[in-house]
Amino acid sequence: MVRIISLLFASIVFFSFIESKSTPYVVVLGIAQDGGAPHAACTKECCIHKWDNPQLHNQVSSIGIVDPLTNEVWIIDATPDFSVQLNTLTMEQKRVFKGVFLTHAHIGHYTGLIHLGREVMGAKEIPVYAMPKMEIFLTNNGPWSQLIELNNIDIKSLKNNTSVSLNDNLSITPFLVPHRDEFSETVGYKIQGPNKSLIFIPDIDKWEKWNINIQDMVHENDFSLLDGTFYDINELPGRDMSKIPHPFIVETFKVLEKVKNKSSVHFIHLNHTNPALNTSSNATKEIRKNGFNVAKRNQKFNL
């Protein structure tokens, strides 16, 4: 009887291991705001110690989607750190790069597309998924229009709240969020796997400006990567914070105060001034004390 139980336990462990190796997942490729950290021209304490130590650099906010079964990968947002992030995601081209999903037309989220052009990769019809205004922006403005003309990229049109099937295991759905939409609309994404789902909202103005209840969305999904650009209103002395609206992390504490799955929330898209970039800071401790987390580069979320 003991032998049977032991064999049964060993079988469960074995098949759980096999399943974990084949489960699709999201991987964090960067957690910083558009300019990364250290930030251009920044000589403040938040940056000065990072310049000479590449290991302390925080790459720009981006996530990858990986399906180990099919060996396929997709990237959400083409950042200024695209070359490094693509290399990480594809494991030095050992995985098949299937496309880019864009959130909006701010510099940290689409300018990495330039690496797909003939000056660098000379890519062949890489699918780039974009909302209508984003598609118009890329089509009508160089150098992005050249990527289309030379067939480096193949624009795939997205629609609000309309799911896109990536393969038999994965789907992705864009949803509009309020943001400074100078050149395009802004979206977040829901990524659905065989077992779990994740939402990614790197940029939004304020939660109360959205016609969707963020409490419900967090509750309904297994993981949430949310805009954590600024910790609080005191972060940029001398700047009018109303001109660069984001939900302060301390505001999100209150908004999600009654949510039961707080630990599923991971803040991302942190400005170079954000003390939460420092894992031992009081801000980071306060985030954890309130039941939340800060996303980490290379962190994986099984779907």
Residues covered by each model-derived region:
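Short internal beta-strands
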Residues: 101, 126-135, 225, 266-268
